[in-house]
Design a protein with these regions (language model features):
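Charge-patterned, long linear interaction tracts outside catalytic cores
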Residues: 15, 19-29, 41, 131-168, ...
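Short hydrophobic alpha-helical runs that function as membrane-insertion/retention elements
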Residues: 52-55, 77-82, 285-289, 313-317
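Short helix/loop capping segments that flank catalytic or ligand/cofactor-binding pockets
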Residues: 5-8, 15-18, 35, 63, ...
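C-terminal regions of RecA-like/P-loop NTPase motor modules
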Residues: 29-31, 247, 293-415
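P-loop NTPase motor domains
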Residues: 1-5, 11, 59-76, 82-284, ...
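Residues in the short beta-alpha loop(s) of Rossmann-like NAD(P)-binding domains
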Residues: 58, 217, 292, 319
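Glycine-rich phosphate-binding loop of nucleotide-binding enzymes
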Residues: 1-81
Length: 415
């Protein structure tokens, strides 16, 4: 009908019991208007006070981030781009007060297991248990001796010198088959001082996301790096989880674009489950955005950890996936009515208006197709069309970096 609608897809459905979590799963092929819709969604959440952390692989949110930075006079809108000169690093053992709750200890253990094992390696109960004990014992050590700097380096030294000796002296010996500590130390050596990734887990300045409400991590440059990509993604998620625990009564949103692939291995399933559980507990929402149907269909981890924990499903134009749609339908648990709604997207759009349609389903109870139609200035802020993006950036450069003014001027010319 073209009538603007106010749509609440987080709180009202939760109050009414339509959904049991605020997480969202977004699927749309390239060119379906996915990035555009997400920019529109994210801006509205941000304007209503939400703290947003984005993990992106394609500069989709650069324009919006820059607008927010200018609007807040540099107070907000932080854009981290991962480069070799400026890598993202953090300290998993950092706390303000030496307080490590069970969840914090678990997340450290999961991070270490991820660094140690390849995606195909099975983690045994003994390995998980021993590493958990080592983390516990190290935490007791740094609490007792405040001269030890809590970081990965001092943990590695504790593991190599003290924990290994303690293992050998035990009455009941742990066999190498059950827990090969030497193999672990060799594998983790690259993250210890002098190793090629020694910067990653020994940061002296922690990533402080607490005061910033809009933060983008652009990790495109390492998405093909099988070693770095999962670690950096976990580091960012850890920073987000720390923020969630400390910020009470405020909505927190973690949006992971294609970077979810770094987490779709069997070893990561536990971490994802933990993350989703924590998000729900602290008034947060996790949003996974993807265009890779093959990856979703073939990954049991995605189904169990991501889709089953996302009560809000958002689908854009699926014409590219017509021949795979039965698999998508079964994966997402869609009814035939919902399937018909989704396949009607963009089939009879009004040619006099510029918009793309989107299907939103809530908890398998409510669903409908909506149009994402925005003003010309808003369109120019979000566009991923290269020529339009370049035009906005060029004019902003001429106007001393004022993107908002550049957008206004270009919009006037297009009216």
């Amino acid at each position: 009908s073209g009538r603007p609608l106010h749509l609440d897809i987080s709180d009202e459905p939760m109050k009414k019991g339509i959904i049991t979590n605020r997480n969202k799963f977004v699927l749309g092929g390239s060119g379906s208007g996915k990035s555009f819709f997400m920019n529109h969604l994210v801006r509205q959440y941000w304007e209503q006070g939400t703290h947003v952390v984005l993990v992106d692989t394609g500069n989709s949110y650069q324009g919006l981030c820059e607008l927010i930075r200018r609007k807040t006079k540099g107070e907000d809108g932080v854009y981290f781009t991962y480069t070799e000169e400026h890598p993202i690093s953090f300290n998993p053992f950092y706390t303000d007060d030496y307080y490590f709750d069970v969840e914090k200890k678990d997340s450290i253990k999961t991070l270490l297991l991820t660094l140690w094992k390849t995606e195909d390696d099975k983690i045994t109960k003994t390995e998980s248990g021993e590493l958990g004990s080592a983390v516990n014992a190290y935490i007791e050590r740094i609490r007792a001796d405040r001269n030890i700097v809590p970081c990965f380096d001092s943990f590695y030294e504790y593991l190599r010198d003290d924990y290994r000796r303690e293992l050998e002296e035990r009455e009941i010996r742990v066999s190498r088959e059950d827990f090969n500590i030497d193999n672990m130390l060799i594998t983790l050596r690259q993250y210890y001082k002098g190793g090629r990734y020694d910067f990653l887990l020994n940061s002296r300045a922690n990533i402080d996301l607490l005061s910033k409400r809009f933060v983008v991590f652009e990790v495109d440059s390492i998405k093909e790096n099988k070693e770095l990509f999962p670690v950096v993604t976990i580091i960012i998620m850890e920073a987000f989880i720390n923020k969630m625990r400390r910020l009470k009564g405020v909505r927190k949103q973690l949006i992971v674009e294609e970077a979810w692939k770094a987490l779709s291995t069997a070893n990561m399933a536990e971490y994802l489950r933990y993350m989703y559980k924590t998000v729900r507990k602290y008034y947060g929402e996790a949003i996974v955005v993807t265009q890779e149907v093959e990856d979703i269909i073939s990954s049991p981890v995605v189904k169990e950890a991501i889709i089953n924990n996302s009560d809000c499903k958002i689908l854009l134009d699926q014409r590219k996936f017509m021949n795979r749609f039965d698999a998508i339908q079964s994966l997402l648990g869609l009814t035939d009515k919902e399937k018909a709604q989704i396949l009607s997207i963009n089939q009879s759009n009004d040619p006099s208006r510029k918009y793309k349609e989107v299907w939103i389903g809530l908890g398998g109870v409510q669903s409908a197709v909506y149009a994402t139609e925005v003003s010309v200035p808003e369109y120019l802020a979000y566009t991923t069309e290269e020529t339009e993006k370049v035009e906005v950036q060029r004019l902003a450069g001429e106007l001393g970096g004022d993107m908002e003014l550049a957008i206004r001027q270009l919009a006037e010319g297009k009216r």
